[in-house]
Amino acid sequence: MSRPERSRSPVSLGAGIGAGLAAAGLAAVGAVTVDRLWRDRRHAIALGTEDDFTVAPSEVAVVVADDGVPLHVEIDEPEGWDGSRPTVILSHGFTLDLRCWVFQRRALLEAGHRVVTWDLRGHGTSGEGAEESYNIEQLGVDLARVIQQVAPTGDLVLAGHSMGGMTVMALAEADPGLFRDRVVAVALISTSAGGLHRITWGVGSMLGRVVNKFGPTALTQLSPHQDLLDSVLRGGKELQEFFVARGSFGSPVPLSLVRLTADMIFGTPLTVISAFTHTLEDHDKREALANMGGQEVLVFNGDKDVLTSAVHSTEIVDAIPGAEHVFVRDAGHIIMLEHPELLNQELFDLLTRADRSRGQTPREAGSRHTVTDLTKRRRDRMTRPARGRTRARA
């Protein structure tokens, strides 16, 4: 007697697909990569599993964008702040949220600076907008609205990572007067002014072109199936973390940072990812860089960034007279979590330069230097596990 055929729910089907994808993925990448997966995992655990990445803000605000989308904003204000120092506004990147700035928020607040962080539309706890609103120009409008609501007066320092840097460029294009009158410094971190079709995603130029050509279409087709994808991702959690670590960082980081990054990336709705992926291809704010010529500018990026490589940062520096270019060895795209101490120090130096340059003619030439995080490199070497395939758990 034959058994009755059972129908499978999308969740159970997704879990099965997830397990299958994990197995297939491991088989595809081969024994060497499997060994690396578990070795990297042991190393990540050895580096620590501390997972307190929260900051208790002084104030939480909801800024309503011009099209009605609620934008989540957090304000960190030091005790006794009198407005004499500039407000630092941090804009995060694509598929991240304001949690990525945890180390910079802590350091800047401790140093006595007022800090504003916000979730871009469709990211974190901000609301979602219409599909056509997911473009860089709209993000610039959103940033302007945040400034109007929570930092309407006083000097500003605008820092942006990846798509957050593009957001700052969009604002510079739309409102050069704001930059001339109030913005005293800009930090452009692991970002690009255009030419994102050149991204190789760390898989070489040929495969990179394939991903760039077919990736947006694939995301569009997947976007109605968010629940199924979530089930698939849960089924291959360790493989997911492995590829997040490989694509986001250029050196070993604690497993807790990998998980934080994965949580932000995979917590972003597919519809949002798909819409922004299409608009990123058309991003070009090279001409807007000229509007930053009167400010102190920091350009900060890593040598192992597979998304916004040195080509992009060099192009930005060449377009902004006096910009400081800091190129970090052993650093990937999520550089503010990977090398927080280095970035924090560069932000402090940027603020110092901005204060010293008040009323002076903008510099005609900045400096370019490559740095190595020696403290982190020593820590990584001390905790590096021996070769082997003993599976690590955490």
Show the residue positions of the predicted features.
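Catalytic active-site module of serine/aspartate enzymes centered on a nucleophile-bearing elbow/loop
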Residues: P4, D318-A394
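Short beta-strand/loop motif that positions the catalytic acidic residue
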Residues: M292-G293, V299-N301, D305
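Conserved alpha/beta-hydrolase catalytic His-Asp/Glu region
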Residues: L222-N291
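Conserved HGGG/HGGXW glycine-rich cap/lid loop of the alpha/beta-hydrolase fold
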Residues: V69, E74-G127
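Active-site loop/oxyanion-hole signature of alpha/beta-hydrolase fold enzymes
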Residues: H123-F179, Q345
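Hydrophobic alpha-helical topogenic segments used for membrane insertion/localization
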Residues: R8-R39
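N-terminal cap/lid segment of alpha/beta-hydrolase-fold proteins
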Residues: L47-E77
